[in-house]
Regions:
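Residue-level hotspots at or immediately adjacent to binding/recognition sites across diverse folds
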Residues: 1-112
Length: 112
């Protein structure tokens, strides 16, 4: 596992080969979240009532409290994502920085 976040009274963790697990009891036990994602996920965050996970050529987004995640394929790899002041910010290979307000549409930051 590579990343973990807390939001809406639950923990989510992500890892290799699309691994996505959650805990609804403060980490005492974990269950696998059904997902079609097969690419590695490196980080996940909660903000704007949305969970956003990032990884190898992919972004996953949940707007229904983590019940389902939609995969958005990318041409770039994000290694980490955070949320603050209403914006998701992701960083990745080749020193890229992207921002998004919803996790779906990403804008490259020039220059950094």
């Amino acid at each position: 596992l590579y990343g973990i976040t807390f939001g809406n009274n639950q923990f989510f963790s992500v890892g290799s080969s699309g691994k996505l697990i959650k805990s609804i009891n403060n980490g005492s036990s974990w269950s696998t979240v059904d997902s079609t994602v097969t690419k590695s996920l490196y980080s996940i965050v909660f903000g704007n009532s949305t969970f956003v996970g990032v990884g190898y050529l992919t972004v996953i987004v949940s707007t229904d409290n983590g019940s389902t995640f939609t995969e958005k394929e990318n041409t770039y790899t994000f290694n980490d994502v955070t949320f603050g002041n209403g914006v998701f910010v992701a960083v990745g290979d080749n020193e890229i920085i992207y921002t998004s307000t919803d996790g779906d549409d990403w804008t490259k930051v020039y220059p950094w």
